[in-house]
Amino acid sequence: MKISKWAYSIEEGPIEPVYVYEAPVRFWHWAQCAAFFMLVITGFLIGWPPIANYATTWDTYFFGNIILLHLVCGMLFAVLMLYRIYWAFVGNKYSRMIFILPFWDMEWIKGIFGTALYYLFLNKHPKEYVGHNPLAQTAMCLMYVLGSILIILTGLGPVSYTHLTL
């Protein structure tokens, strides 16, 4: 089986099993997913806090724990993203797929449009890829990688003011 260098398409030969997603990438995926959902849940509770005026402040420190959990999950989210960037350098060639978009490779660009046509039911037979297809690779880079970086940068902004409250 021959795999193209940048588009990761199967060019010729019978399909064989390929070890694409290593254990550290799988761990990162599920840990990042858990941190993200905890950030969503705690962020929702921070935005629309529960009513807690039925006891003293000491007894109802529930909201403070929500903010602490949100802060811890945000830091975990940032550390996991740094870990994933590190693994893109030391992992196999498929671990850097979502970080490098090979716009210089015409086969990869054609793969974006070919996959989009298949998803729109305009093409009957998709091209086979190892790992992510070019359209998924582009979507993950733009929405996940850049989105995560923006989430981290905007989330760390409020943390810089915590020294004022001490």
Each predicted region: which residue ranges?
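Membrane-proximal soluble regions of multi-pass membrane proteins
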Residues: 92-127
